[in-house]
Amino acid sequence: MLKYSLSTLATLIVFLPLSGTAAETDRQSLDDAWWTGPIVAAGAATLPAGHTLIEPYVYDVITRGRYDGDGNYRSSDTVHSYGSLTYMLYGVTDSFTAGVIPTFGFNDVGSGADSSGIGVGDVTLQAQFRLSQFREGGRVPTSSLVLQQTLPTGKYDQLGTRPSDGLGAGAYTTSLALHSQYYLWMPNGRILRTRFNVAYALSDSVAVADTSVYGTREGFRGHAEPGDTFSLYSAWEYSVTNNWVLALDAFYQHDSGTHIRGTDLVTGNAEPERVPFRADSGSSWRFGIAPAIEYNWTSRVGVIVGVRWFAAGRNTGASITPVAAINMVY
């Protein structure tokens, strides 16, 4: 029902006729509307050839509990996962943009040892191919295919007494997404920019040793198989003035679950021995929103501040994440 509702809402937003708008003299021009972009849903537009986008994000994932297998909230110790990610993109041609997205992080846990220092997370390579271009007065949105390859550069196992040092997944993850973006003129003549994205990601098997981000302990030897992830994103940005924009994301994600297989080292007996170990996380889902406000100094430089909140879910963490970013296009 949730997926159906999101898809229906996004379809209405993308293909709603441009009726009931203000008189042409009051109609905001596209050049007058400056955007930073919402927090979660990435854009469908590609950069003009030869141009560069730099957009660093900083955030604090505050986790105070989780949603159990029945979707009920269960509280736990508070964990702060401070992090940053930076989009570094380049317009190779007008319809093809490529780049890299590095991440860094630090975990401040409620009990136990914090991260030993700021660490490198996984790095993502991105290629974006534009399929169509929005034209004012038309019904076709800007759309693009986005291919991402995440490289396991972050530490994820052999964490010793500091599980909080785990900032990566250890897996090569491939994601394919379809992004779309459309513009609507509201009755007062102001522009509402909408986005609807759908993505699917799959990861390879990961060799795991000792304490890891997968919950294994010292002495473990085996593999983890992260589950596939399906995601839906929808976003709305309302141009209050050419500088100020109100933004809202709504998103849904479903994970098919992680399987762990291997052996644990048991040392309680006279002779240490290895015993089989297996665990399955089970499938999970989460639904969240991310309200935000943007301020744009020019059409090429702007900032956004907002909060991402996981409002519901099953077998997943319950977190709220303050986020800030600056968007710069050269």
List the model feature ranges, each with a label.
Residues 20-65, 135-142:
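Outer-membrane beta-barrel biogenesis signature
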Residues 43, 54, 86-92, 125-131, ...:
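Residues on the lipid-exposed face of transmembrane beta-strands in outer-membrane beta-barrel proteins
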Residues 56-60, 100-104, 145-151, 194-202, ...:
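Transmembrane beta-barrel strands of outer-membrane/channel proteins
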Residues 42-51, 95, 133-142, 185-192, ...:
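Short loop/turn motifs that connect adjacent beta-strands in outer-membrane beta-barrel proteins
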Residues 65-74, 218-330:
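Outer membrane beta-barrel transmembrane domains
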Residues 49-59, 165-274:
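Detector for outer-membrane/organellar transmembrane beta-barrel domains
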Residues 25-31, 59-84, 113, 164-165:
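Surface-exposed strand-loop-strand hairpins of Gram-negative outer-membrane beta-barrel proteins
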